[in-house]
Curated annotation (Swiss-Prot):
Pathway: Aminoacyl-tRNA biosynthesis; selenocysteinyl-tRNA(Sec) biosynthesis; L-seryl-tRNA(Sec) from L-serine and tRNA(Sec): step 1/1. GO terms for biological process: selenocysteine biosynthetic process; seryl-tRNA aminoacylation. This is Serine--tRNA ligase. It comes from Thermus thermophilus (strain ATCC 27634 / DSM 579 / HB8). HAMAP family: Ser_tRNA_synth_type1. It is an enzyme of class 6 (ligase).
Length: 421
């Protein structure tokens, strides 16, 4: 959510943000509704003031005036009730619209849709094989590393790993948590579900509600990232300045409906309904300098993880129309997938300034004693099984086995993934 005061003072800034981010929102209608709310508040205050004045006059009024004053007080009470009901309705409408207002993006963001995304860095080179390489599905089938019957049990976009590959997935998650702990982040294991308020706080609702599964007969929804829970942990609190920045590494199984992705990545591990994710989350003081420092830290963490996994990757500056309504800046990290001959996203590093904090009521007391909204940031540390597809394809050997990166050998106790059986 944006600062309503700033929205009133600089509507042209938000008109541009709406246009550049491709948000379907009538800002003039929102501002007109805001004016209605202000006028209703003013009129309600006037009515309440007059009603109080009338109530004070009644006990001292002469008999011939008392009945009229009582009638006037009753009429003012009825008018106040009508105004309060109208105000509640208009404020609810205004809040629903304010939830849709995008945060203006940083000046360095390319303007446009996905086609305007710009590569800003490339590390490592795609592998060169002396043999015909296999894709990750063929490698799993050759080595007996996945269970094809799982679709009969759990439907499409499900997966079940076996043998060394099952252990490899678990090793990767522990590796990521250990890495984040060494970087000073607090490791946390978290639930995979939350109430609607938490999704509103991150901005997943209302914009991405179709990607979220509701748990029947409850007020809970399955999360697609630990960010949802982490962002809600301190909702309503006023944190001491000395506690900032908060730096969390949250692990939770994640779920996405993949609505709208019909026909995309239907084979293998690239797009599944349930996956596992270690998420980086930072809450900082409200300054661009602090946010920029945290952004670079989150990005460097992701890069170092990929270097340790010995994977070729690139960084992409995400354009305004592709970054989402709440983002100030977003840089995607993409890893090379040999079977497709292109880079695929594995991480999204995002700075959201106070957009989430206003929605989730995340505040702190600054050194001058003022209560302010914090800034939030997040980035993936590691998500499986997508990263497994990259590891299998980039590290495959001629005999179909797969090499284990040096950083993972202590976790696996071996240098090569062996076939099942």
């Amino acid at each position: 959510m944006v600062d309503l005061k700033r929205l009133r003072q600089e509507p042209e800034v938000f008109h541009r943000a709406i246009r550049e981010k491709g948000v379907a929102l009538d800002l003039e209608a929102l501002l007109a509704l805001d004016q209605e709310v202000q006028e209703l508040k003013k009129r309600l205050q006037e009515v309440q003031t007059e009603r109080n004045q009338v109530a004070k006059r009644v006990p001292k009024a002469p008999p011939e005036e008392k009945e009229a004053l009582i009638a006037r007080g009753r009429a003012l009470g009825e008018e106040a009730k009508r105004l309060e009901e109208a105000l509640r309705e208009k404020e609810a409408q205004l809040e629903a619209l304010l939830l849709q207002v995008p945060l203006p993006p940083w000046p360095g963001a390319p303007v446009g849709g996905e086609e305007a995304n710009r590569e800003i860095k490339r590390v490592g080179s795609p592998p060169e094989f002396s043999f015909p390489p296999l894709d990750h599905v063929a490698l799993m089938e050759k080595n007996g590393w996945w269970e094809p019957r799982i679709s009969q049990v759990s439907g499409s976009r499900s997966y079940a790993l076996k043998g060394d590959l099952a252990l490899y997935e678990l090793a990767l998650l522990r590796f990521a948590m250990d890495f984040m702990a060494r970087r000073g982040f607090l490791p946390m294991t978290l639930p995979s579900y939350a109430r609607e308020k938490a999704f509103l706080g991150t901005g997943h609702f209302p914009a991405y509600r179709d990607q979220v599964w509701a748990i029947a007969e409850t007020d809970l929804y399955l999360t697609g990232t630990a960010e949802v829970v982490l962002n809600a942990l301190h909702s309503g609190e006023i944190l001491p300045y000395e506690a900032l920045p908060l730096r969390y590494a949250g692990y939770a199984p994640a779920f996405r409906s993949e609505a709208g992705s019909f026909g995309k990545d239907v084979r293998g591990l690239m797009r599944v309904h349930q996956f596992h994710k270690v998420e980086q989350y930072v809450l900082t003081e409200a300054s661009l300098e602090a946010s920029d420092r945290a952004f670079q830290e989150l990005l460097e963490n992701a890069e170092e993880i990929l270097r340790l996994l010995e994977l070729p990757y690139r960084l992409v500056e995400v354009a305004t129309g592709d970054m989402g309504p709440g983002k100030w800046r977003q840089v995607d990290v993409e890893v090379y997938l040999p079977s497709e001959g292109r880079y695929r996203e594995t991480h999204s590093c995002s700075a959201l300034l106070d957009w989430q904090a206003r929605r989730a009521n995340l505040r702190y007391r600054d050194p001058e004693g003022r209560v302010r909204y914090a800034y939030t940031l997040n980035n993936t540390a590691l998500a499986t099984p997508r990263i497994l597809a990259m590891l299998l394809e980039n590290h495959q050997l001629q005999d179909g086995r797969v090499r284990v990166p040096k950083a993972l050998v202590p976790y696996m106790g071996k240098e090569v993934l062996e076939p099942c059986g």
